[in-house]
Amino acid sequence: MDSYVTVDPSFHSPRISLEILVPTKYAKLFTLKQLSRMLALSCKHRARQAANPVSKRTSRDRNGSKTMGQGPSAVAPQVSKGHNQQVDGGVCLAPVKSKRAVRREKRRTAAKKATNKAKTETKLVKKGGSSIHAPKAPKRTSYLSSLLSSPSGAKAKMGALSKPPQTKNAPDANEGGFTLTAITPAECRAEARRRFHPITGSSRGPYGFCTRSREGCGVCADCVEKKAHLDFNRSFDTIGTSRVIRVDSMMEEVAEDLASPSVLEPSGFWAPAEKQAPSGEGHSRRRCDVVTLARVTPVLRMLRKVDPTLVDNRLLWEAAFRTVFPQRKCVYPHGCFCDRG
């Protein structure tokens, strides 16, 4: 089936024989002149390829051309049927990048972008220096503090470029940005009973008496406030908690463009110990599951960013939970704070 073609002697080269074996389908397609031109071009291309240094991954076939382990080795110049015939006989010798080379190029560009981004990122500079109130690193870090500062045990892999954590704007717990204090429910009730709001600092008036009925109508502002206060106090008995973890943020001087709620959490932001971590005191305690907290916490931050006035923790928790889990009837995973289901 194959036919021998004798090449014009003007294309002589000491390394290449005068006769090339051309498949019959190509011999029918092209004239002798075109075939000889193809041979000359392929020789040039082979020489050009041979000049390039061979990487470890590539190997050479018998003809000296590089093979990447993909497709047949380049023994003869292949012509695709459907293409329009070119001047050189339909052979396009433009160097085509292999899939691996394309992937390598993509990886390099991504790495360059990442390094450039890391260079341009600005860090939060504190004017006050190291804080006096910086607490000692706790033996058992609570779940909230592990959200705020990445744990020291988890080291990023050398080669892998990991995404920056979502909490990167939050101050480090060990730098005095936050103090985690465990207080008793009695202390928490006492704080709630104070006349000024622990977060906003605005003074709260005393609970008024319902003007409509002696028992309380349950509709007016005074009744609503009184009921919320009673529910809050009763919540400690419902959960059966022994400690409450209060998170105080140290108010530091921060540049005005950084003074956003994501950078400085409101002071007095506290959460029941159930939402934190296992107590480790021997007795198991019902607490919010970690998945729930991990899904709700970013929403809390977003809500606080949208509306900084929405700092009351209970309101925030409920709003975030409704956002994340709209199908659940009750906001709290282990039953409600109040008794109305």
From Swiss-Prot:
Location of region: Disordered: 46-175
The organism sits in which domain of life? Answer: Viruses
Here the segments flagged for biased composition (Basic residues) are 97-116
Q: Which residue windows does the record flag with biased composition (Low complexity)? A: 142-152
Which residue spans adopt a coiled-coil conformation according to this UniProt entry?
none
* Extra information: This protein is encoded from a satellite RNA, called RNA3.
Q: Tell me its family.
A: Belongs to the nepovirus protein P3 family.
According to UniProt, the name of this protein is Protein P3
